[in-house]
Amino acid sequence: MAREKFDRSKPHVNVGTIGHIDHGKTTLTAAICTVLAKEGKSAATRYDQIDKAPEEKARGITINSAHVEYSSDKRHYAHVDCPGHADYIKNMITGAAQMDGAILVVSATDSVMPQTREHILLARQVGVPRMVVFLNKCDIATDEEVQELVAEEVRDLLTSYGFDGKNTPIIYGSALKALEGDPKWEAKIHDLMNAVDEWIPTPEREVDKPFLLAIEDTMTITGRGTVVTGRVERGELKVGQEIEIVGLRPIRKAVVTGIEMFKKELDSAMAGDNAGVLLRGVDRKEVERGQVLAKPGSIKPHKKFKAEIYALKKEEGGRHTGFLNGYRPQFYFRTTDVTGSISLPENTEMVLPGDNTSITVELIAPIACEKGSKFSIREGGRTVGAGSVTEVLE
């Protein structure tokens, strides 16, 4: 599919379908595209186009996920749908497809199932702020009392995981009937989009967040000082501003005396740019790859944190055997590896390839991280897992 010109006039929001296998996530994704295509707000996308999701790599991990685009009257959406349960877990933990909100699909014929719970928990852990519920297959489970009972169960479940279950919108629909063009059920897709427009918050743009650049390389320019290069992850940096150098060593401040991109001098660099930053009064020996430049006070170095991780299966290039408490791999944050030890939850003896679990990590050197920071777990240079920081401890 050719990328159309990106319409910047509407706010951009990333969403995704989550929920138990065969509850209708992919059918709903196809239905949204098909119904909105009638109004020219999406490209019509068939079920099999979404189901044959292409492979992509994120943090050394292969993930299958399908991406579609559509618009409502208010916003432009990028929507991700994953074919397999493991793909969802990998997607959420690696942040391969950022989700500003989710559409939770629950079948009215089955109610809440194990993956429903797991996806809600993961969404909570990785910081998805809100979700809208689509109660699917209401053309089959026509008994209104049954539908109400399922809706109540979903609300209770959302509340138990820290979401606002009481006020979360629940749309009663049939993805299949909407996909087939039945007007009664097509109307429910419009109801769903209105709920997504209203309930899922517009995310803060990356450029409006506090400045952060991950250092990839350092060099000395004779007579001018030290230059660090790297990609601006978020925010904006202007010449003359003071920044902090964070991670691996004690925090130190420095003033930016120049910014360069593609061999041109610039006044500023912003989110997404690869830039060289000239720092006054910093010796090259005092900065290194793996540190970050950041707006003062915006991020702290931490050695100990809690995380949600996914251990790669053997077929995915992961370990052939599980790992125990005290396992010491490398944790790759942004641009560098730091060794650390893993503590498993109380009743977990071992993490097997293909598992996802919560762990506590203690690194040998502090690294700039915060809730939501992503990392890879590596052993001898190969990726054996992926993780997302859920809480910083010290």
UniProtKB/Swiss-Prot annotation:
Q: Where in the cell is it found?
A: Cytoplasm
The organism of origin for this protein: Mycoplasma pneumoniae (strain ATCC 29342 / M129 / Subtype 1) (Mycoplasmoides pneumoniae)
- Assembly state and interactors? Monomer.
PANTHER family the record matches: ELONGATION FACTOR TU, MITOCHONDRIAL, ELONGATION FACTOR TU-RELATED
Is-annotated flag, keyword Magnesium?
Answer: yes
Quote the record's binding site residues for Mg(2+).
26
Q: What is this protein called?
A: Elongation factor Tu
Function field: GTP hydrolase that promotes the GTP-dependent binding of aminoacyl-tRNA to the A-site of ribosomes during protein biosynthesis.
Q: Which residues form the tr-type G domain?
A: 10-204
Q: What is the lineage of its organism?
A: Bacteria, Bacillati, Mycoplasmatota, Mycoplasmoidales, Mycoplasmoidaceae
**Cited PROSITE patterns:** G_TR_1, G_TR_2
Region (G5) residue spans? 174-176
Q: Give an example GO molecular function.
A: GTP binding
Cellular compartments per GO CC = cytosol; external side of plasma membrane; membrane
